[in-house]
Amino acid sequence: MFSLKMRASKDGVHVSGAERISTENKIEEIANSLIKRALFHENGTPDTINLKLEKITSEITYLKHIPIKTLISNNKETSRNISRNILRKELEVYFLKNGKDFGKIDILIDTAFEIIDKGNMRGAAVLDLDGNRLEEDTEKGVRVKNIDTSEELKSKILADSKLTDRTIDAIAIATKVLNFGFIAEICTSDNYSYNIGYVATKSGYFRIPNLKNEGEFGGRVFFIENSANIEEIFEKIEKTPVIVY
Ligand code: PML
């Protein structure tokens, strides 16, 4: 198998990026589709497209995608409350296990909201249960790399008119991080006009419309236990090749 990574920029500013894991006979087709994706991106036509092709030498991990649940909400306040409740329920388990004060759960969730609303990060922020940021570089955050979804999962998602290409990328990220040591994730899109976000826990990928308003920044936060081996987990979410099916 081969890894293909595309990065496109305009005037030195990142416009789009995507990656795929491919068999040898599909490299050409996938390389074309990645170039097309870069050329016709909503953020504008790039002036530079980098395409990197690498042979994958380590074993690929296949993961079943977490269940997709689309929720209904027509305003940001309700959406934030829904996401808070899902996160609170999950975090309570880990606060209890680690003997932590339940009163601090909402402060932790507020910290995550502040990070996603501030935006402007290429990767994700990582918070432990005390709200400490754990990334080496908090400007960049951590990147989840070497992932793809099976053709069957892509077709299944796109056959549902409510779901989008963004769901495909996001379900791959959420499934990988939840299987590699993180407790939960919250995400809003960095695309100004895309207001569907999600909260992911082991119970599901909860898609929540209006998790931000149009025109606002977006971001990603992963939650992790304080005792987790972050060096090992960060290395795995970046390097272990995963196909989500
Ligand atoms: C979805 O519609 O399921 C994806 C929501 C998150 C999008 C994040 C992004 O692509 O920027």
Swiss-Prot record:
Cofactors: Mg(2+)
Q: Which GO terms describe its biological process?
A: biotin biosynthetic process
- Cite the EC number: 6.2.1.14
Read off the InterPro entries from this record: BioW
User: What does it catalyze?
Assistant: heptanedioate + ATP + CoA = 6-carboxyhexanoyl-CoA + AMP + diphosphate
| Keyword presence, ATP-binding | yes
Task: State any single GO MF term.
Answer: 6-carboxyhexanoate-CoA ligase activity
Query: What general EC class does the enzyme of this chain belong to?
Result: ligase
Q: In which pathway does it act?
A: Metabolic intermediate metabolism; pimeloyl-CoA biosynthesis; pimeloyl-CoA from pimelate: step 1/1
Span of the signal peptide: none
Keywords on record: ATP-binding, Biotin biosynthesis, Ligase, Magnesium, Nucleotide-binding
Name the family. Belongs to the BioW family.
Quote the subunit structure annotation: Homodimer.
Q: Which HAMAP family match?
A: BioW
Function description: Catalyzes the transformation of pimelate into pimeloyl-CoA with concomitant hydrolysis of ATP to AMP.
What NCBIfam families does UniProt report for this protein, alphabetically?
Answer: PRK01322.1
Q: What is this protein called?
A: 6-carboxyhexanoate--CoA ligase
Q: Give the organism, scientific name.
A: Methanococcus vannielii (strain ATCC 35089 / DSM 1224 / JCM 13029 / OCM 148 / SB)
